[in-house]
Amino acid sequence: MDTMRWQDDHLLLLDQTKLPLTEEYIECWDHVILCDAIKKLKVRGAPAIGAAAAFGVALAALNYTGEDRAEFEADVKKAIADLGKTRPTAVNLFWALRRMEAVLEDIRTYSVKEQQERLIAEAKAVFDEDRAMNEQMGQYGLELIPESAGILTHCNAGALATAGFGTALGVIRAAHRAGKEISVFADETRPLLQGARLTAWELMQDGIPVTLITDSMAAYVMKQKLVDLVIVGADRITANGDVANKIGTYGVALAAKAHGIPFYVAAPVSTFDLSLESGLQIPIEERDTEEVRRVGDSITAPPGVPVYNPAFDVTPAELVTAFITDRGVFRPPYLETLRAMAETK
């Protein structure tokens, strides 16, 4: 099961809106199709969005059939701008686009064909590096997982949310591979049920014991002493350690704090936005109100009832026990340790 796969001249993208019942791939022949897929959550998860966006730039480059370098550059930069408008919160998107644009600037004197080849190679590198970072994160996170641990996770931060292996689920996978007898509670994650549809499915595919719960049950299973730690992913982390992640994460963190349970965030360095001082500066995406009025095709609320549907919330740094990254585990004080992390090679 691949989240995405480059095939010669186009991108195959697993349609996550069809999971867990149907495994169907979308053929992306241009960046416009990819923009639509990102907006509609057919691909989601900050690292996966970043990798997909890099391939979107490669598609735009490949679709140019002329030889005028200025025209080529304009086409690619338009694609970068279009991709940057798809989702505002996940910082990996902008990190990947800046990386692709930097390559474009470096090679602007090359022939169009050479530029196309370099941009495709860079997109593949973004993808491959993300997978490697996730594997590394899993190894660093192993030390934090006790034997026979009960682990609660929210949303989906697995292979589906990345280029492969996963961030939060990558740590869980690493613990499972190491022979630790762990079990997982997966919040269903309303309104789009990423925990129920994706996390539960991923863990079952890997033979990792998982129990699905509604979001409102999280505090109760903690009180019942069924949870030893919480581990989640992230869409953006600021310089002070504030964390934007799927809506509901903040509530889980508060419950973990109240019950004395460690709350860990697993994320690659590309998810850290040290240009922002705190979570107050993170733009929070608001999505279609129908996502809340419906579950799938079923209407579950009175037609026309007002809805508030932020896709993310911000968990304050003081609720985060530690960050698990591809460069190690970082603990408070985050203003110091996260800057040290950024300087680590």
Curated annotation (Swiss-Prot):
Q: Which InterPro entries match?
A: IF-2B-related (IPR000649), IF-M1Pi (IPR005251), IF_2B-like_C (IPR042529), Initiation_fac_2B_a/b/d (IPR011559), M1Pi_N (IPR027363), NagB/RpiA_transferase-like (IPR037171)
Q: Which organism is it from?
A: Heliobacterium modesticaldum (strain ATCC 51547 / Ice1)
Site residues by UniProt (Transition state stabilizer): C155
As for family, the record states: Belongs to the eIF-2B alpha/beta/delta subunits family. MtnA subfamily.
What this chain does, per the entry, is described as: Catalyzes the interconversion of methylthioribose-1-phosphate (MTR-1-P) into methylthioribulose-1-phosphate (MTRu-1-P).
Q: Which residues form a coiled coil?
A: none
Which gene carries the instructions for this protein?
mtnA
Name of the protein described by the UniProt record: Methylthioribose-1-phosphate isomerase
What pathway, per the record? Amino-acid biosynthesis; L-methionine biosynthesis via salvage pathway; L-methionine from S-methyl-5-thio-alpha-D-ribose 1-phosphate: step 1/6
Gene Ontology terms, MF aspect = S-methyl-5-thioribose-1-phosphate isomerase activity
Stated EC number for the protein is 5.3.1.23
